[in-house]
Amino acid sequence: ALREALRQLPERERQVIALRFYHGLTQQRAAGILHISQVQVSRLERRAVERLREWLAT
């Protein structure tokens, strides 16, 4: 179920989740890799986690 939900995420959100949770990077480090701000990583992460919670709850 989780794998399928991850596949449904927009690409950028999926990248953030992979870097943060699979690779254990900080938001700052993930931001550097993706060439975006730490604030943007935070927003993308929050959105992705909210989507995953919704999808996995149903």
Show the residue positions of the predicted features.
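A short pre-motif secondary-structure segment
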Residues: 16-20
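A short, glycine-centered helix-capping/turn motif at helix boundaries
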Residues: 10, 23-26
